[in-house]
């Protein structure tokens, strides 16, 4: 298969046992009108035909992979949105905007549905969900397998609102880290959605296993429970209802965490990162003065950090002759990567190969104040806390780290904020209500600003004392790393209602 076509068209074909399970969720009779909007290699069609379904329609834009009397070899995106199907089933293509072909991008830019509900941050499969619902009859059923991140990402708010306004979910199967497709790392779900019907409760099948799914007996693999139907376009929580109640109680003590500002220093250095890293050699004093200490995700732990990597950073205007004269070791090391550095995208500006591209917020990071670093992404399947690290002055973040600064009008100490973010309550809140993709939590600006934050009531002496005790305990822990201090910190946090009891 053409690899570029596979990526731009999202061609990851569904295993037969998954197809059989999904068809088993259908309740319409064998004469029902059924649509498969992205047939791929025809595995859904073949299974439906074998089971006696005859009124079938399918779309597949790639005529090279299937030719079939039931298949229309054109784009489903341009199909007519008339409510005409009893059931729609399939595996829509998952493609990020940057991986779409120019023809696909133009098709979406010209599409009124895409313009109404989506944007260039959205995934291609969003429009397949929306158009499928538009083409269902009232009472019709949509059964799809797709990534689960539309439950939580900011860019899917329009899709979530559309789904709430046009029907209800009947069943959702959460695969989490279970392997469903070969070569696909995204966490996926199967859902059954009924158009125009208000279903009070959703049946959730939650599979908590990393083992590959090899059988159509899927429901025996996970925990089954019911949750109330989704009622807003906010993050959809699929955990059992008692967990949602506990999270709501925790939130009642808090406000959203707009008490910090999130910044980054570098744009992505990708594989050129090594070109700017300094090695274990005797650099000159001038070279050391033109370097910075950078913390990576691997250096971070809860509360503290374990080290840093030195990076070359020449800010003054120089030419290559000056580089050779004043920074001979830098010149030698950069020369090993020169060809690659010269090929970097420069936005049509002059970019010497020895300079970091698009350095941002440098003056902010150079302030003489502590800040909090956290990995941009964190796998949580075997963890019970995050790695919010209180970092010293003049330590800079690299591209796999998100940095948080306390705003000037915030009275709470940076130590208190660090303790709060490392609490079990915040961990559970992010686990169930944050942006989570396959047990990987994302710490970008929007997810961070959504975290509830427990402010101190400075009029209450008891709260002020707890705040000061937590501040001093964090400083003590950073000094001697005594594990018992963490228990004392948590006890004080719980006195402020910073806990989730599940």
UniProtKB/Swiss-Prot annotation:
User: What InterPro entries does UniProt report for this protein, alphabetically?
Assistant: DNA_methylase_A-5, DNA_methylase_N6_adenine_CS, MethylTrfase_TaqI-like_dom, N4_N6_ade-DNA_methylase, SAM-dependent_MTases_sf
Q: Which organism is it from?
A: Haemophilus influenzae
Q: What are the recorded GO MF terms, alphabetically?
A: DNA binding; N-methyltransferase activity; site-specific DNA-methyltransferase (adenine-specific) activity
Q: Which Gene3D superfamilies match?
A: Vaccinia Virus protein VP39
Point out the gene that encodes the protein. hincIIM
Report the SUPFAM superfamilies cross-referenced here: S-adenosyl-L-methionine-dependent methyltransferases
Instruction: Give the protein family.
Output: Belongs to the N(4)/N(6)-methyltransferase family.
One GO biological-process annotation of the entry reads: methylation
Key words of the record: DNA-binding, Methyltransferase, Restriction system, S-adenosyl-L-methionine, Transferase
Name by which UniProt lists this protein: Type II methyltransferase M.HincII
Q: Which residues form a coiled coil?
A: none
Enzyme class (EC, first level): transferase
**Reaction(s) catalysed (UniProt annotation):** a 2'-deoxyadenosine in DNA + S-adenosyl-L-methionine = an N(6)-methyl-2'-deoxyadenosine in DNA + S-adenosyl-L-homocysteine + H(+)
Q: What EC number(s) does its UniProt record assign? A: 2.1.1.72
